[in-house]
């Protein structure tokens, strides 16, 4: 019986150790697949590791291969890998002898055609749109004249120069630039952080908070603009409390940030034009408005001056206003003296009449009493005159004060009168229109009544009107005599006729008896 473990059995196979075999396989694989291109779908991608390397797998419907992108290569990629993205990877296949595994070390990575990226964009667009990030109700209006503009873009290149130059030409304002990467690894994070950073600034802080933001980048391929399709960028733009203008690429380039932004500009230069107005145009408009305003003010002032002059011409002068009070005062003063004098004379005469009938002692007493009474009355009269003079003087002072304030009061009353006149004019216009409407309606009704009462309508029913030789209507047969020419008026015309006999009075008519004339008495014409 042969020994199965007999080492002396003849063989042609070389004997390898595990390490030798693994090393041989490694050399064979790496030599045969030193540079390969693999098409597949990214699976298990979780972003770069803390070390900066990225680990994931490429798969199709029947197989799977592990893949790795080293940190240095990952930073040079034009776009960020994403789960489910179909890509074409270029690199080399390596093995690990310690675990008998192989993987592809990716050196370049590109989407598997623009269709794959567009499909990914459409899927992301539907997802974010379903969340309401693109709703028109979320859009904010741009400020007409911002004081501070925040720009998120690369600090180098033509984009920032074009924006600054355009703003300086149109309306120079303060511009804050937040420098970011606009392409490659980390570009999306930097753009999103810049948008959130501007929104985090407090109004009135050490750094002025922008009134409007511009996120800008020059044109490029779909891969170059891919950072602006990142979900983190789109969400930051939609959450921005500051109005945001997106200006990514050329007019034909659309990215997802364009849908989330409040306004999309076709180019970075167009964004600058949307952000600020043209200063020269505003100055021209302000000058034109100022000229119109000054013209209106001048016209109003001229009208007011003319109105005041007309009112002043209509007002009497100060002397005319004071003439009547002065005359009355003078007449009162003159009359008072004469009245006192006449009163004194009358009293003295009465006193003399009474004194002739009195005894000397009684007369002396009465004279003393009357003299005292007269003195008292004279004192009261003097006080009365003084009071009257004081009152007249006070009235004159008040009249002068009223005359001094008369222009102001007249202006106030004129303004009120003008306002009342305007109101009365409008009310009168409305009332006149109503009255005209009612008058027209009444006239129309009366016209209809007049038409219904017109004798022409009666003639149409077969009647006729008889007129005498003077064209006067004949209403009684007795008014006609034989041989008189008459006209018969019908509805359609007139015919002439001749009466053959005189008219007979009605049966109930009585002839008036004639009184005999008195030959001895002249008749009266009346």
UniProtKB/Swiss-Prot annotation:
Keyword Mitochondrion recorded: no
Catalytic activity: Exonucleolytic cleavage in either 5'- to 3'- or 3'- to 5'-direction to yield nucleoside 5'-phosphates
First-tier enzyme category under EC: hydrolase
Gene Ontology cellular component list: cytoplasm; exodeoxyribonuclease VII complex
GO BP term (any one): DNA catabolic process
Keywords, in A-Z order: Cytoplasm, Exonuclease, Hydrolase, Nuclease
Gene Ontology MF term list: exodeoxyribonuclease VII activity; nucleic acid binding
Pfam annotation, one family: Exonuc_VII_L
EC code(s) of this entry: 3.1.11.6
Region of interest called Disordered, as start-end residue ranges on this chain: 496-526
UniProt subcellular location: Cytoplasm
Recorded coiled-coil stretches: none
Subunit structure: Heterooligomer composed of large and small subunits.
Protein family (similarity comment): Belongs to the XseA family.
Function: Bidirectionally degrades single-stranded DNA into large acid-insoluble oligonucleotides, which are then degraded further into small acid-soluble oligonucleotides.
Name of the protein in its database record: Exodeoxyribonuclease 7 large subunit
Origin species: Rhizobium etli (strain CIAT 652)
Lineage of origin: Bacteria, Pseudomonadati, Pseudomonadota, Alphaproteobacteria, Hyphomicrobiales
Gene: xseA
């Amino acid at each position: 019986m042969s020994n199965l473990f007999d080492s002396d059995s003849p063989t042609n196979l070389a004997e390898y150790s595990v390490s030798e075999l693994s090393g041989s396989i490694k050399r064979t694989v790496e030599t045969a697949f030193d540079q390969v291109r693999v098409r597949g779908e990214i699976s298990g991608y979780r972003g770069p590791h803390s070390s900066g390397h990225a680990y994931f797998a490429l798969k199709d419907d029947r197989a799977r291969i592990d893949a790795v992108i080293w940190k240095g290569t990952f930073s040079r990629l034009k776009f960020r890998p994403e789960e489910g993205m179909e890509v074409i990877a270029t690199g080399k296949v390596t093995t690990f002898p310690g675990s008998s595994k192989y993987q592809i070390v990716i050196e370049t990575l590109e989407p598997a055609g623009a269709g794959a990226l567009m499909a990914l964009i459409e899927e992301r667009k539907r997802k974010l749109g379903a969340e309401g990030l693109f709703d028109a109700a979320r859009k904010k209006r741009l400020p007409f004249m911002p004081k501070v503009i925040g720009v998120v873009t690369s600090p180098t290149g033509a984009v920032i120069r074009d924006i600054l130059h355009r703003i300086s030409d149109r309306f120079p304002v303060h511009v804050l630039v937040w420098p970011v990467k606009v392409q490659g690894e980390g570009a999306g994070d930097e753009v999103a952080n810049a948008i959130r950073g501007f929104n985090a600034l407090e109004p009135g802080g050490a750094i002025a908070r922008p009134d409007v933001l511009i996120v800008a980048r020059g044109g490029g391929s779909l891969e170059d603009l891919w950072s602006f399709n990142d979900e983190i960028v789109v969400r930051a733009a939609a959450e921005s409390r500051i109005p945001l203008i997106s200006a990514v690429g050329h007019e034909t380039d659309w990215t997802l940030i364009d849908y989330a932004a409040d306004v999309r500009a076709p180019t970075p230069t167009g964004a600058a034009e949307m952000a600020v107005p043209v200063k020269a145009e505003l100055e021209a408009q302000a000058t034109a408005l100022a000229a119109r305003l000054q013209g209106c003010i001048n016209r109003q002032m001229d009208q007011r001056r003319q109105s005041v002059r007309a009112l002043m011409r209509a007002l009497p002068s100060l002397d005319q206003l004071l003439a009547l009070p002065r005359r009355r005062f003078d007449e009162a003063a003159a009359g008072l003296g004469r009245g006192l004098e006449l009163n004194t004379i009358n009293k003295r005469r009465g006193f003399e009449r009474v004194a002739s009938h009195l005894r000397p002692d009684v007369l002396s007493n009465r004279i003393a009493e009357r003299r005292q009474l007269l003195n008292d009355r004279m004192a009261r009269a003097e006080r009365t005159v003084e009071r009257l003079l004081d009152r007249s003087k006070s009235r004159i002072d008040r009249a002068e004060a009223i005359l001094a304030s008369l222009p102001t009061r007249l202006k106030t009353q004129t303004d009120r009168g003008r306002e009342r006149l305007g109101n009365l004019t409008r009310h009168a216009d409305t009332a006149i229109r109503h009255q005209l409407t009612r008058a027209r309606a009444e006239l129309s009704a009366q016209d209809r009544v007049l038409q219904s009462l017109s004798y022409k309508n009666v003639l149409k029913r077969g009647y006729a009107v008889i007129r005498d030789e003077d064209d006067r209507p004949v209403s009684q047969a007795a008014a006609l005599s034989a041989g008189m020419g008459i006209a018969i008026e019908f509805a359609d015309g007139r015919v002439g006729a001749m009466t053959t006999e005189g008219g007979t009075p009605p049966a109930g008519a009585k002839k008036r008896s004639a009184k005999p004339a008195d030959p001895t008495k002249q008749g009266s014409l009346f």
